[in-house]
Amino acid sequence: MSLHLKPGQLTLADLRQAYLAPVRLSLDPSADAPVAASVACVENIIAEGRTAYGINTGFGLLASTRISPADLEKLQRSIVLSHAAGVGEALDDAMVRLVMLLKVNSLARGFSGIRRKVIDALIALINAEVYPHIPLKGSVGASGDLAPLAHMSLVLIGESRARHRGEWLPAAEALAVAGLEPLTLAAKEGLALLNGTQVSTAYALRGLFEAEDLFAAATVCGGLSVEAMLGSRAPFDARIHAARGQRGQIDVAAAYRDLLTASSEVARSHEKCDKVQDPYSLRCQPQVMGACLTQMRQAAEVLEIEANAVSDNPLVFAAEGDVISGGNFHAEPVAMAADNLALALAEIGSLSERRISLMMDMHMSQLPPFLVANGGVNSGFMIAQVTAAALASDNKALAHPASVDSLPTSANQEDHVSMAPNAGKRLWAMAENVRGILAVEWLGACQGLDFREGLKSSPKLEQARRLLRDKVPYYQEDRFFAPDIEAASQLLASGCLNALLPARLLPSL
C-alpha cells in the first residue's frame, strides 16, 4: 500500500490498511514550512536565552532545573535512554508500524519543534519495514506514552534493536537497512518523540478494527441463528426501528433485512407457523447490536481525531514565537473510547452466547439436543456451549472501565493519569474471546440449518455457510471439537464475513 500523508488528514480506512500490511509512506510538501518554522522558533528561544520547558529545562518534577546550552543535546539523548523502561513482550510489526505512522502524522503538523530530518528517519524505517523493539507494557497514558515511545526512539540514536522481516538486528544494522545512520537529537527533539498518545491510540485502534470485524461476523451469525431457529423476520421491520429513531438500531435492522431476504427457503417453510414472539437474543438483535454500533461509531470518531492530533508537550506556536506547556498528552479521550468499545465487545459476545444456548435446547429450537443425532451416545455441542459461556463471563470482568483507575506518578507532578494503554490492550483479549464465542455460534447455526431438511437460506447467508463448510464438515457424530472451533476462529480473524454487510455500516470499512 502507498500512502501520501497530508499531516492531520489520516482516515480510519488509511489506518486500517496501514495496520494490516506494510505501507510505502511519503509526506506531502505542505509539511515543510510549518515543520521548519517550529524548529526556527526553538532555535530562537535558545539564542535569546529564554527558558522553555523541555527545551532547556529538566522534565516532570525537574522542570525548574535550567539546563546549560552545552548540555542540550545530552539532555535529549538522556531522556530517550532513561525513559526506555518498558517491560513485556515486543509489539508485533503491525502495531509498531501503526505507532510510527501516528507519530509521523503528529510531528509533521509543525507544532513540535523537530527537524524534518528526524521525521524522514521515521518514514525511512516504515518504508524499509524496520520495526523498533517496543515492549507492550510501561505506559499509563499521561504524560503521553513515554516508555514505549522512548523504545521506538532508541533505534534512531543507535541504541537497542529492531526487527526486519522477522529477524532482530542491532540498531546500527537496522538503521543501515533503511539507509540511515544514528541521529544526534537537537533541543526539544527527544521530548517531541516521547511525548504523545500514539501508543495508546494504536492500541485502541487495533481494538476498534477487531471489534468491527467481530460486529460484522456477529450480525451474520445472528442471521444464521434466526434461520436455524426458524425465527421470525417481523422484528426487523423498518417501521419498528423508525418509530424509536436510534440510528444504530435502524442501520442494524436494515443489515439484517439485507441478510434475511424473502428468497430464503427456510423462511418460506414456516411462514404460517403460530409462533408469536422469539426470545430476546433473536428478536432484539437490532436493539442490542444497534447500541453496540453507536458506541463503536462514537469511539471511532474520537480515535480518528486523536490519530490526527498533536499530543506533544510543550507545543510550539511559531507564528507567535511561543512555546506553551499544556496537557494534550493526557489520553483520557482514548481511554474512554476504548472503555466504550469494551462494553460493545462484551455485549456482542454475550448476545451470541445466548443464541448458542437457545440452539442447544431442543424445547426452544425444535432441533436435536445439542445439535447432534443419536444424543446420549453423542454429546454434540454440549461443551462447546460451555466454552462460549466461559469466554462471555471472562469478558464481563475485562469490560470494567480502565479510565476510572488512576495512580499518581513522577512524585505527584503527574497526579492523574488515563490508563489508556490498559484500556486499549485489554480489547485484544476481549476480541479473542468474542471470536471464540462467534466461532461456536457459526458452527452451531450451520449445523442447525443442516437439520432443516435441506432447505436453503438467503444468498448471503448461504455464502457464509459455504465458507464454513469448506473448512469444517457437518457433525455426523462426535469428534475432536477444538480444531473445528480453531478453524472457524481463523476464518473470522480474516474478516471474511465483512463483505456480507452493507458498505459504510462500520467506520473503517
Curated annotation (Swiss-Prot):
Main localisation, per the record?
cytoplasm
Query: Renumbered to this chain, where is the cross-link 5-imidazolinone (Ala-Gly)?
Result: 142-144
Q: Which GO terms describe its biological process?
A: L-histidine catabolic process to glutamate and formamide; L-histidine catabolic process to glutamate and formate
Which enzyme type, at the first EC level? lyase
Keyword hit for Oxidoreductase:
no
Q: How is it modified after translation?
A: Contains an active site 4-methylidene-imidazol-5-one (MIO), which is formed autocatalytically by cyclization and dehydration of residues Ala-Ser-Gly.
Catalytic reaction list: L-histidine = trans-urocanate + NH4(+)
Residues with PTM 2,3-didehydroalanine (Ser): 143
> So what EC number does this one have?
4.3.1.3
Any one GO molecular-function label of the UniProt entry: histidine ammonia-lyase activity
As for subcellular location, the record says: Cytoplasm
The record, for CDD domains, names: PAL-HAL
Query: Per the record, what is one GO cellular component?
Result: cytoplasm
* Pathway noted in the entry: Amino-acid degradation; L-histidine degradation into L-glutamate; N-formimidoyl-L-glutamate from L-histidine: step 1/3
- Keywords carried by this UniProt record: Cytoplasm, Histidine metabolism, Lyase
Superkingdom, taxonomy of origin = Bacteria
PANTHER family linked: HISTIDINE AMMONIA-LYASE (PTHR10362)
Q: Which family does it belong to?
A: Belongs to the PAL/histidase family.
Q: What is this protein called?
A: Histidine ammonia-lyase
Task: List the source organism.
Answer: Pseudomonas aeruginosa (strain UCBPP-PA14)
The UniProt gene name for this protein comes to hutH
